Amino acid sequence: DFDSCKNLISRTRALASLYALGRIDEIYKRINEDSKLDYENLHVAAFSSFIVAIKKKNTLNKFCNEPLNFIYFSNLLSHHDDSGSFINEVVDELKKIKTNWEPSNKTTHKGFQSTFNLFKNPSQKISNLQSIIIRELDSYYSKFKNDSCSLIKRWPLKKNLEGWHVVLKQQGFQSAHIHPKGWLSGVIYLKVVPSLNKNEGAIEFSLNGFNYFHINTPKK
């Protein structure tokens, strides 16, 4: 019984169960009643965004009701005149880092993933990459600083990066997921397969969750 657990994850799973049962009024009631309790619960924030998009009715959860409007793109070209050489140097350093094939309890399928935070005692090129990410975080905030959602209004003053690297092989992919312990998530593609106009290797952003889904949910 999810209600008896009373923790960050169980409250979201209870909402997903209510959605499966079609109890929409109860969903809104719970999200609104717990809006102050869950103001930084990204599991609930993600579900709230989902239900708002489907039902076209806002909740009192103000973390970020329209997350697809906060997608931000950049390019290493804007940080390095010779970005190709920089990428190759980063890749060479990443090759020295231990990885596991399809690690358990992770979202990597048919691929390798590193086992620890790359930005803890980083090598030179990875440290340079870390500096680029920090500058991009500042650019991200500058772009959205006038928005009233909690994602921006409660923007952390201290930057603490956690990262890992993934190498996907043939037919490899990342299953749908969020990073509930991170204020903001991102990905840097260092090497990609040719697109062939079929979106091979492309990331998809959606409001659907691991255990809740609607065919008309917006995606990018």
Explain the meaning of each model-derived region.
Residues 1-54:
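Alpha-helical protein-protein interaction scaffolds
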Residues 19, 28, 39, 72, ...:
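Sequence-level detector for tyrosine residue identity
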Residues 25-37, 62-83, 166, 173-176:
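Charged, low-complexity, helix/coiled-coil-prone segments
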Residues 47, 74-81, 89, 93, ...:
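Structured loops at beta-to-helix junctions and adjacent beta-edge loops in soluble globular domains
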Residues 56-58:
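Terminal transmembrane helix and immediately flanking juxtamembrane interfaces
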Residues 60-152:
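Non-heme Fe(II)/2-oxoglutarate
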Residues 124-134, 138-220:
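Catalytic core of non-heme Fe(II) oxygenases with the double-stranded beta-helix
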